[in-house]
């Protein structure tokens, strides 16, 4: 990792707003350098948020939300409240995104506010749990919706589900490695299937209501509990719902590429989050018009069961549409995770080979292969709902830490420019909700939450050995350099270059900056004084 930082800074002298080589455009500039361009306008920004939120969650999580909520009415309330809380969290991230205008999202914010260790733990848990788990769940959902029509009287075989999910991951990894343009076109095509599936579900729900089929939506029936209310289970219902809203913060990963981020970042949030909340709530209402709670809980593919009850001979449309949606979701997640891992490697927090791109295709092949391998390993986990709980708990943990960092930054640095400045009541509301989820989730599922925390804490020794400890044995450095060289030759990749950076004079200074928080105890202590204190 140390060498990765050295190679990175040889070619990349960062300005205060972040690196100019953090992404991988489809072609290099004439001088051999790679630079980010501000090409994401308002429409594209909304597409990033909506496209990343609407994945497999709305087709998988309705079962988990209803099961833990205990009644139809409370389940609908969970979907509405989760959407509102998501909007509050997105507003907090909007302020952070323009105050710390770096790509990398909450990883960059946590690193700059709390220091290198905290940022590394965020990246570490994303590498080990969040992205592999998310991609595994979406891939398993894809395979379930493809195979379910072939097994109308029983569940598809587990081995078949996992094999098809693995094939899906390998195929899309190849597409993303081959061309950024190909990956973008795949995303556009399969987003159409995603929107078609949800529009069809909502329209059929409206038709059902017009026909008087709304028994479970009547107040006396909607709040008829089929199990004893439990505050811990309600917290788990919110975690299941939060999985469906996952991806609302992905626009912050590409802040440096936004056209006029001070305007378009909050505008995209104001448009996208209410739109997704509307779609999610009415999709769940549509499910209830066609299925009883017992039927919904018994279904392993909610949207397929919905289509079978309402579409008759055209029921095949639903599994195909949902499969298209989840296939595109895997593609988008692979693309996003490669950007995050690339950014982490650029900061010296991941092996330097992950910061390399193909010499002609300009795709981050090592980062894509790494995330594909980690997702394939995650497929051995037997219960996808346990995977969702892992993702939800750890995500809320770091969402809360990031929003807490917003309050810390207000206190420590009250005078720094803030083009967007929200009322402090918003982060406080979000933190209270976050605390409620974590406390009661830990109470209800101590083993699941404990495993998530244990995985996160494994990053502490890795950080001190891999990042903080700079004077490693020469034999270790030579071995890592050999592995990096072999990987370069196998993948035909190089470090991206930009004009204006040469030599190694900034290496120690920038590595020291990684380990220091933005909020220093002594305001006058800057990078120069830190560098002078080095032996």
From Swiss-Prot:
Q: In which tissues is it expressed?
A: Mainly expressed in kidney and small intestine.
- Ranges per topology, Cytoplasmic: 1-44, 96-116, 179-181, 253-265, 339-364, 409-423, 467-535
Q: Which GO terms describe its biological process?
A: L-alanine import across plasma membrane; L-leucine import across plasma membrane; neutral amino acid transport; proline transmembrane transport; thyroid hormone transport; tryptophan transport; valine transport
Where located?
Cell membrane; Basolateral cell membrane
Write down the InterPro entries for this protein, in alphabetical order. Answer: AA/rel_permease1, AminoAcid_Transporter, L_AA_transporter
Keywords, in A-Z order? Amino-acid transport, Antiport, Cell membrane, Disulfide bond, Membrane, Phosphoprotein, Transmembrane, Transmembrane helix, Transport
Q: How does it sit in the membrane?
A: Multi-pass membrane protein
Tell me which residues bind L-tryptophan: 134, 395
Record site: Important for substrate specificity? 134, 246
Return the similarity comment. Belongs to the amino acid-polyamine-organocation (APC) superfamily. L-type amino acid transporter (LAT) (TC 2.A.3.8) family.
Protein name from the UniProt record: Large neutral amino acids transporter small subunit 2
Q: Which organism is it from?
A: Oryctolagus cuniculus (Rabbit)
What is the name of the gene encoding this protein?
SLC7A8
């Amino acid at each position: 990792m140390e060498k990765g930082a050295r190679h990175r800074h040889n070619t990349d002298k960062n300005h205060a707003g972040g690196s100019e080589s953090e992404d991988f455009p489809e072609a290099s500039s004439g001088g051999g350098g790679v630079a980010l361009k501000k090409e994401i306008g308002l429409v594209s920004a909304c597409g990033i948020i909506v496209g990343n939120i609407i994945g497999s969650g709305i087709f998988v999580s309705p079962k988990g939300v209803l099961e833990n909520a205990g009644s139809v009415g409370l389940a609908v309330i969970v979907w509405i409240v989760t959407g509102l809380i998501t909007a509050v969290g997105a507003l907090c991230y909007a302020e952070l995104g323009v105050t710390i205008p770096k790509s990398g999202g909450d990883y960059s914010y946590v690193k700059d506010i709390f220091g290198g260790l905290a940022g590394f733990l965020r990246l570490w848990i994303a590498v080990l749990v969040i992205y592999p788990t998310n991609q595994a769940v979406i891939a398993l959902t894809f395979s379930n919706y493809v195979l379910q029509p072939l097994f109308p009287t029983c569940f598809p075989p587990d081995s078949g589900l996992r094999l098809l999910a693995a094939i899906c991951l390998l195929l899309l990894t190849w597409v993303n490695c081959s061309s950024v343009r190909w990956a973008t076109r795949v995303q556009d095509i399969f987003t159409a299937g995603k929107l078609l599936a949800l529009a069809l579900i909502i329209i059929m729900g409206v038709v059902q209501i017009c026909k008087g089929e709304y028994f479970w939506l009547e107040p006396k029936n909607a709040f008829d509990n089929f199990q004893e209310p439990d505050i811990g289970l309600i917290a788990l219902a919110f975690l299941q719902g939060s999985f469906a809203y996952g991806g609302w913060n992905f626009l912050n990963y590409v802040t440096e590429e936004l056209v006029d981020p001070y305007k378009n970042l909050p505008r995209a949030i104001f448009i996208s989050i209410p739109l997704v909340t509307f779609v999610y709530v009415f999709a769940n209402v549509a499910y209830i018009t066609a299925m009883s709670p017992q039927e919904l809980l018994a279904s392993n593919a909610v949207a397929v069961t919905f289509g079978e009850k309402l579409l008759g001979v055209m029921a095949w449309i639903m599994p195909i549409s949902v499969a298209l949606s989840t296939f595109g979701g895997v593609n988008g997640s692979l693309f996003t995770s490669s950007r995050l891992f690339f950014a982490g490697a650029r900061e010296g927090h991941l092996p330097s080979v992950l910061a390399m791109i193909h010499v002609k295709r300009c795709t981050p092949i090592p980062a894509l292969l790494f995330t594909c391998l980690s997702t394939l390993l995650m497929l051995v986990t037997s219960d996808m709902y346990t995977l969702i709980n892992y993702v939800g708990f750890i995500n809320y943990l770091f969402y809360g830490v990031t929003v807490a960092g917003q309050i810390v930054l207000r206190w420590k640095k009250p005078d720094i420019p803030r083009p967007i400045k929200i009322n402090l009541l918003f982060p406080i509301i979000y933190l209270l909700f976050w605390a409620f989820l974590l406390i009661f989730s830990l109470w209800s599922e101590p083993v699941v939450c404990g495993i998530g925390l244990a995985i996160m804490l494994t990053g502490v020794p890795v950080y001190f050995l891999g990042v903080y400890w700079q004077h490693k044995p020469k034999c270790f450095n030579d071995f890592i350099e050999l592995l990096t060289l072999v990987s370069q030759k196998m993948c035909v990749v190089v470090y991206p270059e930009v004009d204006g950076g040469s030599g190694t004079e900034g290496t120690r200074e920038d590595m020291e900056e990684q380990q220091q928080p933005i909020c220093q105890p002594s305001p006058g202590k800057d990078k120069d004084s830190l560098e002078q204190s080095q032996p």
